[in-house]
Amino acid sequence: MEAPPVTMMPVTGGTINMMEYLLQGSVLDHSLESLIHRLRGLCDNMEPETFVDHEMVFLLKGQQASPFVLRARRSLDRAGAPWHLRYLGQPEMGDKNRHALVRNCVDIATSENLTDFLMEMGFRMDHEFVARGHLFRKGIMKIVVYKIFRILVPGNTDNTEALSLSYLVELSVVAPAGQDMVSDDMRNFAEQLKPLVHLEKIDPKRLM
C-alpha cells in the first residue's frame, strides 16, 4: 500500500530526486480506536483527514527480469480531485544503520484519462483495490492508518470486502536524496506508538 494517499511536492525548476523514507506495521481492528486516540495526541493540532482511494497497479513487461510497475490512484470521496501516478523504486541497500526503508519516489497529479494513457503505452492492469483510512501529520512526517478492500467485480468500487481483520500503519517522509537524518525522527516517533503498534523497516522483497 503502499496504499495511502500521496503528497505533492512542488518543483519550481530543474529536477529534484525525491526519496521516500518508510516504516510500516499493522494493528488489529479492535485496537484501532486506541491508536487513533494516541495519534491525535502526538500529531499536529488539526483534525485527521479521512480518505477512500481506488488504486490500480499497472505492469509493463519487457526484456528485464522484473516488470516496470506504476500505480494509478484516485479519490472516491473527493469529487474533482486529480488522479495520481506514482512510481516507487527499489529499496536502497545502503547503510544498515539507517532506521527506515528508503526508495526513490515520483508522484505526479494527472488528468482523469490516466488509465487509458497507460494502456496505450502498453501497460496492463495487474490488480486493483480500495483503501479506506485516516491521515495524520507531524511536521514533515505523514502517518496513515488504513484498511485494504478487495474489489469483487473488476472496476466496481462499490462491491468490496475487507482483505484482513487489521489496519496497515505507515509512517513516511518524502524528502530530497541525502536527508537521512529524518529516519532518526521517524524512529523516535515510532517509539511513542509502542506497544499499540510496532513500526519497522520492512523490505518488500522479503514478503514475496
Swiss-Prot record:
Q: Known Pfam families for this protein?
A: Med18
User: Does the keyword Nucleus feature in the UniProt annotation?
Assistant: yes
Keywords, ordered alphabetically = Activator, Nucleus, Phosphoprotein, Transcription, Transcription regulation
Q: Name one GO molecular function term.
A: transcription coregulator activity
Q: What's a GO biological-process term for it?
A: positive regulation of transcription initiation by RNA polymerase II
Q: Which residues are reported to carry the modification Phosphoserine?
A: S66
Listed GO CC annotations: core mediator complex; mediator complex
Does this UniProt record's set of keywords contain Cell membrane?
A: no
Q: Hey, which family's this protein in?
A: Belongs to the Mediator complex subunit 18 family.
Which proteins does it associate with, and in what oligomeric form?
Component of the Mediator complex, which is composed of MED1, MED4, MED6, MED7, MED8, MED9, MED10, MED11, MED12, MED13, MED13L, MED14, MED15, MED16, MED17, MED18, MED19, MED20, MED21, MED22, MED23, MED24, MED25, MED26, MED27, MED29, MED30, MED31, CCNC, CDK8 and CDC2L6/CDK11. The MED12, MED13, CCNC and CDK8 subunits form a distinct module termed the CDK8 module. Mediator containing the CDK8 module is less active than Mediator lacking this module in supporting transcriptional activation.
Summary of the function given for this chain in its UniProt record: Component of the Mediator complex, a coactivator involved in the regulated transcription of nearly all RNA polymerase II-dependent genes. Mediator functions as a bridge to convey information from gene-specific regulatory proteins to the basal RNA polymerase II transcription machinery. Mediator is recruited to promoters by direct interactions with regulatory proteins and serves as a scaffold for the assembly of a functional preinitiation complex with RNA polymerase II and the general transcription factors.
This chain belongs to the protein called: Mediator of RNA polymerase II transcription subunit 18
